[in-house]
């Protein structure tokens, strides 16, 4: 049967694979979408394996809270097109839900969780095969407290925060704090929480800045004493 552009576009949206890959898969599968997806998956796994050394700099990061427990997880890929694909985002959400339900302590525990006919890692590998892009779970953190809050930035799936509190906090206030953390990226709750290493680096920067300012002032003073205005030395208005 003839493969139409509408069919190719539909399969591309379903899989995130390239237009030509979708066309070839549909042609080979004689228009059967399920068979075409399987063809793309198998071919894509081989391609993805060759891309193992490539950088996966895009992806989806999501956070979730159950009250006293919160989790953030990141699933990475190579392109923004795949990162925005609904199935890729859903896979990230499904993995997050499993991690929260099982209260996994480490990323390795998450990867080993049962999912579908295999494990979470198998599901990621399958998705990588469908798109032909390198994919990896690369980011996992949990917090626990009397209460927790999360912030997912404007549903963009690229920025989120998780916060744990050691006492009850109004839900709206907790969300606002989580949002402010996303906006300001503070390094500590208060000054006492700033590490000595960070403090020392800031002190060194301040010292170097002060030295530079002192040198500049000394130069300006010396020029002034010699009756030289550095702003006018090269002026075309000067007469010989």
Q: Predicted segment positions?
A:
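N-terminal assembly/interaction segments in proteins that build large macromolecular machines
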Residues: 2-240
């Amino acid at each position: 049967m003839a493969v139409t552009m509408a069919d190719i576009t539909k399969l591309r949206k379903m899989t995130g694979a390239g237009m030509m890959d979708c066309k070839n898969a549909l042609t080979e599968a004689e228009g059967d979408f399920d068979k075409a997806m399987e063809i793309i998956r198998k071919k894509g796994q081989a391609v993805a394996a060759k891309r193992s050394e490539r950088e996966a700099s895009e992806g989806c990061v999501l956070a979730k809270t159950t009250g006293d427990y919160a989790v953030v997880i990141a699933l990475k890929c190579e392109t923004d097109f795949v990162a925005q694909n609904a199935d890729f985002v859903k896979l990230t959400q499904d993995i997050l839900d499993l991690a929260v339900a099982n209260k996994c302590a480490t990323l390795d525990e998450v990867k080993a969780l049962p999912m579908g006919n295999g494990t979470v890692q198998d599901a990621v590998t399958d998705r990588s095969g469908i798109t032909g892009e390198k994919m990896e779970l690369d980011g996992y953190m949990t917090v626990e407290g009397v209460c927790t809050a999360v912030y997912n930035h404007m549903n963009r799936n690229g920025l989120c925060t998780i916060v744990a509190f050691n006492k009850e906090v109004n839900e709206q206030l907790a969300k606002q704090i989580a949002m402010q953390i996303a906006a300001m990226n503070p390094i500590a709750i208060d000054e006492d929480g700033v590490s000595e290493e960070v403090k020392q680096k800031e002190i060194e920067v301040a010292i170097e800045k002060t030295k530079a300012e002192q040198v500049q002032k000394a130069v300006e003073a010396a020029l002034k004493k010699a009756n030289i205005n550095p702003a006018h030395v090269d002026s075309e208005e000067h007469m010989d």
